[in-house]
Amino acid sequence: MHIWVDADACPAVIKDILFRAAQRWQRPLTLVANQMLRTPPSPLIRAIQVPRGFDVADGYIVEHAGSGDLVITGDIPLAAQVLEKQALVLSPRGERYTADTIRERLSMRDMMEELRSAGIDTGGPAAFSQADRRAFANALDRLMLASARA
């Protein structure tokens, strides 16, 4: 299982959890972003800087992620694309996206986009919390354990 991270919007605390998990579980970890990223020295961890542009990092992840890989992203369209390739998807808040749940998330995203286009303030996501951090760490551990048993 290769771990791919949509790193532009991924919180630093989540990246730190992923760095430790890559070492602990001996899994390759690739962070993809349109900016320079710092990573700890490890043969398992690398950062890919893609050119700036709309969905360039997403396109890189879609192109390279494969069946059984894990993709970390809060980007619903990206999640839908990699799910089609049989990858696993986990949000930085610890929500596991599946083929069943992604349709609902895409519909909700589209509805919120329509409201914003109509000038309605829909607010933003809640601030990232300790509970989100714990939820992510726990969900990641469950996925890593399941992968190790397979």
Curated annotation (Swiss-Prot):
Segments passing through the bilayer: none
Origin superkingdom: Bacteria
InterPro entries linked to this entry: UPF0178 (IPR003791)
Family, as annotated: Belongs to the UPF0178 family.
PANTHER family: UPF0178 PROTEIN YAII (PTHR35146:SF1)
Protein name in the entry: UPF0178 protein Bpet3884
Organism this protein belongs to: Bordetella petrii (strain ATCC BAA-461 / DSM 12804 / CCUG 43448)
